[in-house]
Amino acid sequence: MITRFAPSPTGPLHLGHAFAAILAHDMARAAGGRFLLRIEDIDRARAKPQWEAQLLDDLRWLGITWDGPVLRQSDRLPLYRDALERLWQRGLVYSCTCSRRDIEQAASAPQEGAPLGPDGIVYPGSCRDKGRPRPGQALPETALRLRMDLAATETGFEETGPAHRGWHEIRPETMIRAVGDVVLARREMGTSYHLSVVLDDAAQGVTHVTRGEDLFEATCIHVTLQRLLGLPVPVYHHHGLIRDDAGKRLAKRDNARALSKYRAEGASPADIRRLIGL
Protein backbone atom coordinates (compact mmCIF):
# COMPACT_ATOMS: atom_id res chain seq x y z
CA MET A 1 0.00 0.00 0.00
CA ILE A 2 1.23 3.47 -0.91
CA THR A 3 -0.68 6.49 0.38
CA ARG A 4 0.04 10.19 0.29
CA PHE A 5 -0.81 13.51 1.91
CA ALA A 6 -0.88 16.44 -0.50
CA PRO A 7 -1.44 19.81 1.20
CA SER A 8 -1.33 23.22 -0.46
CA PRO A 9 0.97 25.79 1.21
CA THR A 10 -1.62 28.56 1.09
CA GLY A 11 -2.34 28.88 4.80
CA PRO A 12 -1.95 27.13 8.16
CA LEU A 13 -2.74 23.46 8.66
CA HIS A 14 -5.86 22.93 10.77
CA LEU A 15 -7.48 19.96 12.49
CA GLY A 16 -8.96 18.73 9.21
CA HIS A 17 -5.49 18.53 7.68
CA ALA A 18 -4.23 16.70 10.76
CA PHE A 19 -7.01 14.12 10.36
CA ALA A 20 -6.23 13.58 6.66
CA ALA A 21 -2.48 13.34 7.20
CA ILE A 22 -2.65 11.00 10.20
CA LEU A 23 -5.22 8.73 8.53
CA ALA A 24 -3.15 8.33 5.35
CA HIS A 25 0.04 7.86 7.37
CA ASP A 26 -1.43 5.30 9.76
CA MET A 27 -3.14 3.30 7.00
CA ALA A 28 0.15 2.89 5.16
CA ARG A 29 2.16 2.06 8.27
CA ALA A 30 -0.41 -0.50 9.48
CA ALA A 31 -0.17 -2.27 6.12
CA GLY A 32 3.62 -2.19 6.07
CA GLY A 33 3.45 0.21 3.13
CA ARG A 34 4.83 3.61 2.22
CA PHE A 35 3.54 7.09 3.02
CA LEU A 36 4.47 9.95 0.68
CA LEU A 37 4.27 13.73 0.94
CA ARG A 38 3.43 16.02 -1.97
CA ILE A 39 3.22 19.81 -1.91
CA GLU A 40 0.46 21.03 -4.23
CA ASP A 41 1.77 24.51 -4.99
CA ILE A 42 0.45 25.16 -8.50
CA ASP A 43 -1.45 28.21 -7.23
CA ARG A 44 1.64 30.39 -7.45
CA ALA A 45 -0.22 33.53 -6.39
CA ARG A 46 -1.21 32.01 -3.03
CA ALA A 47 1.45 29.39 -2.28
CA LYS A 48 4.10 30.79 0.07
CA PRO A 49 7.42 29.31 1.30
CA GLN A 50 6.60 30.23 4.89
CA TRP A 51 3.41 28.19 4.80
CA GLU A 52 5.31 25.20 3.40
CA ALA A 53 7.92 25.49 6.16
CA GLN A 54 5.16 25.68 8.77
CA LEU A 55 3.27 22.66 7.46
CA LEU A 56 6.42 20.54 7.35
CA ASP A 57 7.14 21.53 10.95
CA ASP A 58 3.57 20.73 12.00
CA LEU A 59 3.71 17.29 10.38
CA ARG A 60 6.98 16.45 12.11
CA TRP A 61 5.50 17.62 15.41
CA LEU A 62 2.54 15.27 14.89
CA GLY A 63 5.01 12.40 14.55
CA ILE A 64 4.35 11.91 10.85
CA THR A 65 7.28 10.63 8.80
CA TRP A 66 7.30 10.23 5.05
CA ASP A 67 9.25 8.02 2.69
CA GLY A 68 11.47 9.51 0.01
CA PRO A 69 11.77 13.14 -1.04
CA VAL A 70 8.90 15.62 -0.97
CA LEU A 71 7.33 16.03 -4.43
CA ARG A 72 6.46 19.61 -5.40
CA GLN A 73 4.03 20.31 -8.20
CA SER A 74 5.87 23.51 -9.10
CA ASP A 75 8.78 21.31 -10.23
CA ARG A 76 6.53 19.32 -12.57
CA LEU A 77 4.95 21.99 -14.78
CA PRO A 78 6.72 20.74 -17.96
CA LEU A 79 5.26 17.26 -17.36
CA TYR A 80 1.75 18.66 -17.06
CA ARG A 81 2.24 20.61 -20.27
CA ASP A 82 3.46 17.49 -22.04
CA ALA A 83 0.25 15.68 -21.09
CA LEU A 84 -1.80 18.63 -22.33
CA GLU A 85 0.14 18.62 -25.62
CA ARG A 86 -0.73 14.96 -26.13
CA LEU A 87 -4.41 15.57 -25.41
CA TRP A 88 -4.36 18.62 -27.71
CA GLN A 89 -2.88 16.62 -30.57
CA ARG A 90 -5.60 14.00 -30.09
CA GLY A 91 -8.30 16.67 -30.26
CA LEU A 92 -9.43 15.95 -26.71
CA VAL A 93 -8.96 19.44 -25.28
CA TYR A 94 -9.89 22.83 -26.65
CA SER A 95 -9.13 26.47 -25.94
CA CYS A 96 -11.63 28.37 -23.79
CA THR A 97 -11.68 32.14 -23.30
CA CYS A 98 -14.94 32.33 -21.33
CA SER A 99 -14.99 34.26 -18.10
CA ARG A 100 -16.93 33.03 -15.09
CA ARG A 101 -19.55 35.65 -15.88
CA ASP A 102 -19.82 34.38 -19.48
CA ILE A 103 -20.46 30.86 -18.22
CA GLU A 104 -23.05 31.94 -15.68
CA GLN A 105 -24.92 33.98 -18.28
CA ALA A 106 -24.87 31.20 -20.90
CA ALA A 107 -25.86 28.51 -18.42
CA SER A 108 -28.76 30.53 -17.04
CA ALA A 109 -30.37 31.05 -20.45
CA PRO A 110 -33.93 29.62 -20.48
CA GLN A 111 -33.10 26.87 -22.93
CA GLU A 112 -30.08 25.73 -20.94
CA GLY A 113 -30.89 25.82 -17.23
CA ALA A 114 -27.90 25.76 -14.87
CA PRO A 115 -26.93 22.17 -13.95
CA LEU A 116 -24.25 21.84 -11.27
CA GLY A 117 -21.31 19.44 -11.42
CA PRO A 118 -18.24 18.81 -9.23
CA ASP A 119 -16.70 22.13 -10.35
CA GLY A 120 -19.89 24.18 -10.12
CA ILE A 121 -22.00 25.15 -13.13
CA VAL A 122 -21.63 22.57 -15.91
CA TYR A 123 -19.90 24.34 -18.79
CA PRO A 124 -22.41 25.01 -21.61
CA GLY A 125 -19.84 24.41 -24.38
CA SER A 126 -19.58 27.96 -25.71
CA CYS A 127 -15.99 27.53 -26.97
CA ARG A 128 -16.15 23.84 -27.91
CA ASP A 129 -16.23 24.41 -31.68
CA LYS A 130 -14.31 27.66 -32.07
CA GLY A 131 -11.59 26.57 -29.65
CA ARG A 132 -10.89 23.12 -31.09
CA PRO A 133 -7.38 22.34 -32.37
CA ARG A 134 -6.56 23.28 -35.96
CA PRO A 135 -3.98 21.32 -38.00
CA GLY A 136 -0.49 22.33 -36.92
CA GLN A 137 -1.75 24.70 -34.23
CA ALA A 138 0.44 24.95 -31.12
CA LEU A 139 -0.99 24.55 -27.65
CA PRO A 140 -2.57 27.94 -26.86
CA GLU A 141 -1.86 29.95 -23.72
CA THR A 142 -5.51 29.98 -22.67
CA ALA A 143 -7.64 27.87 -20.41
CA LEU A 144 -8.03 24.36 -21.83
CA ARG A 145 -11.12 22.20 -21.41
CA LEU A 146 -11.60 18.46 -21.83
CA ARG A 147 -14.04 17.33 -24.52
CA MET A 148 -16.06 15.05 -22.31
CA ASP A 149 -18.12 13.78 -25.25
CA LEU A 150 -14.92 12.28 -26.68
CA ALA A 151 -13.13 11.45 -23.43
CA ALA A 152 -15.78 9.70 -21.36
CA THR A 153 -15.82 5.92 -21.30
CA GLU A 154 -17.49 3.09 -19.39
CA THR A 155 -15.30 2.59 -16.35
CA GLY A 156 -15.41 2.67 -12.56
CA PHE A 157 -13.46 2.65 -9.31
CA GLU A 158 -13.32 0.94 -5.94
CA GLU A 159 -14.18 3.03 -2.88
CA THR A 160 -13.40 1.94 0.69
CA GLY A 161 -14.54 5.04 2.58
CA PRO A 162 -17.40 4.60 5.07
CA ALA A 163 -19.99 6.73 3.24
CA HIS A 164 -19.53 5.35 -0.29
CA ARG A 165 -18.02 1.88 0.14
CA GLY A 166 -18.19 -0.35 -2.92
CA TRP A 167 -17.73 -0.30 -6.68
CA HIS A 168 -18.85 2.84 -8.50
CA GLU A 169 -19.58 2.74 -12.21
CA ILE A 170 -18.87 5.74 -14.42
CA ARG A 171 -21.07 6.11 -17.49
CA PRO A 172 -20.30 8.37 -20.47
CA GLU A 173 -23.80 9.82 -20.66
CA THR A 174 -23.63 10.86 -17.00
CA MET A 175 -20.20 12.44 -17.43
CA ILE A 176 -21.38 14.46 -20.44
CA ARG A 177 -24.60 15.63 -18.80
CA ALA A 178 -23.63 16.05 -15.14
CA VAL A 179 -19.91 16.88 -15.29
CA GLY A 180 -19.29 18.44 -18.68
CA ASP A 181 -16.12 19.87 -20.21
CA VAL A 182 -13.97 20.44 -17.13
CA VAL A 183 -10.95 22.75 -17.12
CA LEU A 184 -7.64 20.86 -17.42
CA ALA A 185 -5.44 23.96 -17.55
CA ARG A 186 -6.13 27.38 -16.12
CA ARG A 187 -4.53 30.24 -18.02
CA GLU A 188 -2.67 31.58 -14.98
CA MET A 189 -1.45 28.14 -13.81
CA GLY A 190 -0.80 26.11 -16.95
CA THR A 191 -2.49 23.13 -15.30
CA SER A 192 -5.33 22.30 -12.93
CA TYR A 193 -5.94 20.26 -9.81
CA HIS A 194 -7.66 17.52 -11.83
CA LEU A 195 -4.79 17.02 -14.28
CA SER A 196 -1.95 17.41 -11.79
CA VAL A 197 -3.37 15.08 -9.18
CA VAL A 198 -3.78 12.11 -11.54
CA LEU A 199 -0.32 12.57 -13.08
CA ASP A 200 1.30 12.93 -9.67
CA ASP A 201 -0.47 9.95 -8.11
CA ALA A 202 0.70 7.81 -11.03
CA ALA A 203 4.26 9.17 -10.87
CA GLN A 204 4.47 8.41 -7.15
CA GLY A 205 2.92 4.97 -7.51
CA VAL A 206 0.07 5.78 -5.13
CA THR A 207 -2.16 2.72 -4.71
CA HIS A 208 -4.69 4.15 -2.22
CA VAL A 209 -5.89 7.75 -2.41
CA THR A 210 -7.24 8.95 0.93
CA ARG A 211 -8.94 12.34 1.02
CA GLY A 212 -11.99 14.20 2.29
CA GLU A 213 -15.49 13.24 1.19
CA ASP A 214 -15.88 16.71 -0.35
CA LEU A 215 -13.77 15.39 -3.23
CA PHE A 216 -15.81 12.24 -3.84
CA GLU A 217 -17.78 13.78 -6.73
CA ALA A 218 -14.53 14.75 -8.49
CA THR A 219 -13.33 11.14 -8.54
CA CYS A 220 -15.22 10.36 -11.75
CA ILE A 221 -13.17 13.10 -13.45
CA HIS A 222 -9.91 11.69 -12.14
CA VAL A 223 -10.70 8.11 -13.17
CA THR A 224 -11.74 9.31 -16.63
CA LEU A 225 -8.39 11.08 -17.00
CA GLN A 226 -6.51 8.04 -15.72
CA ARG A 227 -8.14 5.86 -18.37
CA LEU A 228 -7.55 8.48 -21.05
CA LEU A 229 -3.84 8.86 -20.22
CA GLY A 230 -3.18 5.16 -19.67
CA LEU A 231 -2.53 5.58 -15.94
CA PRO A 232 -3.35 3.09 -13.17
CA VAL A 233 -6.55 3.67 -11.21
CA PRO A 234 -5.92 3.54 -7.45
CA VAL A 235 -8.35 2.51 -4.74
CA TYR A 236 -10.12 5.56 -3.30
CA HIS A 237 -10.96 6.18 0.36
CA HIS A 238 -12.99 9.31 1.10
CA HIS A 239 -13.19 10.07 4.80
CA GLY A 240 -15.47 12.30 6.81
CA LEU A 241 -14.63 15.95 7.38
CA ILE A 242 -13.74 17.75 10.59
CA ARG A 243 -16.34 20.46 11.13
CA ASP A 244 -16.71 23.46 13.40
CA ASP A 245 -19.37 23.90 16.07
CA ALA A 246 -21.84 25.13 13.44
CA GLY A 247 -21.28 22.04 11.29
CA LYS A 248 -19.24 23.84 8.62
CA ARG A 249 -16.18 22.23 7.05
CA LEU A 250 -12.97 23.70 8.42
CA ALA A 251 -11.08 26.04 6.07
CA LYS A 252 -7.66 27.66 6.30
CA ARG A 253 -9.29 30.92 7.27
CA ASP A 254 -10.44 29.22 10.49
CA ASN A 255 -7.30 30.18 12.36
CA ALA A 256 -8.84 29.21 15.68
CA ARG A 257 -8.42 25.56 14.59
CA ALA A 258 -4.87 25.98 13.25
CA LEU A 259 -2.40 23.42 14.58
CA SER A 260 0.05 26.21 15.37
CA LYS A 261 -2.45 27.70 17.84
CA TYR A 262 -2.97 24.39 19.58
CA ARG A 263 0.79 23.96 19.81
CA ALA A 264 1.22 27.46 21.25
CA GLU A 265 -1.39 26.65 23.89
CA GLY A 266 0.57 23.57 25.00
CA ALA A 267 -1.34 20.78 23.25
CA SER A 268 0.49 17.53 22.52
CA PRO A 269 0.24 15.34 19.40
CA ALA A 270 -1.79 12.90 21.51
CA ASP A 271 -4.21 15.73 22.34
CA ILE A 272 -4.69 16.40 18.63
CA ARG A 273 -5.42 12.73 17.96
CA ARG A 274 -8.05 12.73 20.69
CA LEU A 275 -9.65 15.90 19.31
CA ILE A 276 -10.05 14.39 15.84
CA GLY A 277 -10.98 10.90 16.97
CA LEU A 278 -7.83 9.08 15.88
Curated annotation (Swiss-Prot):
Cross-referenced InterPro entries, in alphabetical order? aa-tRNA-synth_I_CS (IPR001412), Glu/Gln-tRNA-synth (IPR000924), Glu/Gln-tRNA-synth_Ib_cat-dom (IPR020058), GluQ/Sye (IPR049940), Rossmann-like_a/b/a_fold (IPR014729)
Name the Gene Ontology biological process terms: glutamyl-tRNA aminoacylation
Extract the GO molecular function terms from the UniProt entry: ATP binding; glutamate-tRNA ligase activity; metal ion binding
Alphabetized PROSITE patterns for the sequence: AA_TRNA_LIGASE_I
Name the positions where ATP binds. Answer: 252
**Which residues take part in binding L-glutamate?**
4-8, 40, 193, 211
Amino acids binding Zn(2+): 96, 98, 123, 127
Q: Which GO terms describe its cellular component?
A: cytosol
Keyword check for ATP-binding:
yes
What cofactor requirement does the entry state?
Answer: Zn(2+)
Q: Motif 'KMSKS' region: which residue numbers?
A: 249-253
Pfam families (alphabetical): tRNA-synt_1c
Question: Which positions does the motif 'HIGH' region occupy?
Answer: 7-17
EC assignment: the record states 6.1.1.-
- What biological function has been recorded for the protein in this entry? Catalyzes the tRNA-independent activation of glutamate in presence of ATP and the subsequent transfer of glutamate onto a tRNA(Asp). Glutamate is transferred on the 2-amino-5-(4,5-dihydroxy-2-cyclopenten-1-yl) moiety of the queuosine in the wobble position of the QUC anticodon.
Q: Which family does it belong to?
A: Belongs to the class-I aminoacyl-tRNA synthetase family. GluQ subfamily.
* Protein name, entry field: Glutamyl-Q tRNA(Asp) synthetase
Coding gene? gluQ
